Amino acid sequence: MNILAFDTSTEKFSISILKNNKIVLNLSKILNKTYSKFLISILKKSLEKSNLDIKKINCILISLGPGSFTGIRIGIAAAKGLGIPHKINILGYNNMDILVNSVDKKIKKNVITIIKSKKNDYYFQVFNTKKEPLTKTSFFSIYNLPKLFLIKT
């Protein structure tokens, strides 16, 4: 299985390439550029670096956020632009689900996932011990942090 996965939902760009079920490229970098100016180029260069042709990709995974609406739309457009002409499956994923599933299974307490949005703004979601959501993904400012702890689950 060959998979191209990338995330344009935050200022931290991430890309991973799985080739023959092995991770051959995994990069995360904070970028001070607009995704629309470099995304297709960096995706193509990453495939070249991994010695993988786009036609050999079985699936493209793209982040659906939460995060920058514009960044998410650019990522989806790039995934479609690369995937549709080659009939590649395109799947979206939620960053909160990725985060909660990275928590050690030994932890038997509720988990709050938090993703930075802009300067002092964040997204969060509360999950139970079975990693099921107790709340919807919500937005808060750091200035309202005390109110966050009043949420009933």
Regions from the PLM with identified roles:
Residues 1-64:
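N-terminal beta-alpha supersecondary unit
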Residues 11, 65-66, 117-120:
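Short glycine-rich anion-binding loops that position phosphate/pyrophosphate groups of nucleotides
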Residues 14, 70, 121:
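Glycine/Thr-rich phosphate-binding loops of Rossmann-like dinucleotide-binding domains
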Residues 18-19, 74-77, 106, 126-129:
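Short, glycine/charged-enriched secondary-structure capping and boundary segments
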Residues 22-23, 77-83, 121-127:
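Short, basic/glycine-rich phosphate-binding loops at helix/coil junctions
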Residues 59-95:
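DPxDG-like acidic metal-binding loop motif
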Residues 89-91, 96-153:
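Surface "functional belts" at beta-alpha junctions
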